[in-house]
Amino acid sequence: TTAIYHRPESEFAYLYEKDKMHIRLRTARQDVRHVQLLCGDPYTLYKEAWYQQRIEMKKILSTDLHDYWQVSVGAEFRRLSYGFSIESYDGLHVFYGDHGVYPFEQQYLEMNNNYFRMPYFQEADRFKIPEWAKETVWYQIFPERFANGDPSNDPEGVLPWGSKNPDRQDFFGGDLQGVIDHLDYLVDLGINGIYFCPIFEAYSNHKYDTIDYLAIDPAFGDNDTFKRLVEECHKRGIKVMLDAVFNHMGDTSHQWLDVIKNGKDSPFADWFHINEFPVNYKEGENFEDAYDITYDVFAFTPHMPKLNTENPDVQDYLLKIARYWIEEFDIDAWRLDVANEVSHHFWKKFRQVCDDAKDDFYILGEIWHSSQRWLQGDEFHAVMNYAFTDAIIEYFVKDEISMTKMVSELNNQLMLYREQTNQVQFNILDSHDTPRLLTLARGDKDLMRQVMAFTYLQQGVPCLYYGDEIGLTGDMDPDCRK
């Protein structure tokens, strides 16, 4: 009985539809043969002895340690008390309720306060997802490397297209016009959602070091070009998701340059996490590494000072940006970079702004680990599901785990979240942050197809990294950004 577990008002008990709850129970693997839900209205317990009415629960999946049981249940008056009748293979029969495990005897069944509760089916608290997100096939574009549609905006020193494998500071001239020119190609692929890496003004080729969040990078086009891109996407039934880098800014932003110039007297001094003035660092072995940094940064990159999202001025600034691109350009989704290093307090405000701006907006967080805290319905709809797809790659491609272990890991991830979340989790096999799938598969295109087919059949929505469809290869960043 020590493995028996349930937690009310969580992924174990949640409103799935306005009048239906999903209730889950965890037990030790291959220990329990039969589970029933005892449930009824909390105000009629003594009147009707409703605990004598039992609903069968179904074992839905297993991990290497646990079995998971589930049932869908409604309630006439939209409130529910419930407990569990559990029978093990060795003949033990127990009642499990809010106070723990008891013998399955009348005196314990009549303990009103020993039942879990869903006090009321609050529609406002139900985890809602955009319906369109469940049917989306995403295509990730690294704008600087997808297609050069307008050579007139090429940055200085641009290299001939495809002339060499990229270094960290190379430019090849990809832009938004290049995407517009290939939208029909994407439609032919079956794509109906584009996830763009950052397109805002920045110093680097990857644009994660933002200078101005309200301007398209001039090497990619301008705001009018982007507006036309969104309109052309929507004509073709393609949703548009932008990448928001709200954990940090670039060190050539006017805010950070003011801090460098004016130190603690800068009006932006509290916009960042600065531990000592003047701001300084010692260069490391490469452009993106440093040590003895006097301010907090992304990783150890001195060129990406971390934003202080506890500062109300910073919050207002970032929330204005979130609303601006939705209202002015009609984007459909935000992908949030380094989302786990920004406060929950801020993300809750961000979610409210997005919901107010557009009814069916989708929010995706970049989180590489288990993400329950962010997926309670008041922050994100989904995360980049690396924890899920890592298991697939470890089994199919790297041959590091058994099939049984892969299934266990996949099922464990599914049971961390509500059904709604699982329907829109972002199943991504490779990206601008990882080696290319074909490279991991050692050039075996048949294996690559098998992995993609298996992944695309799982719960969640697939994302294809640009160029994978033509067999593009590449090791870790920057090689994966050809």
Describe the function of each predicted region.
Residues A133, G149-F172, H182, H369, ...:
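Loop/helix patches that line or flank the sugar-binding groove of alpha-linked glycan CAZymes
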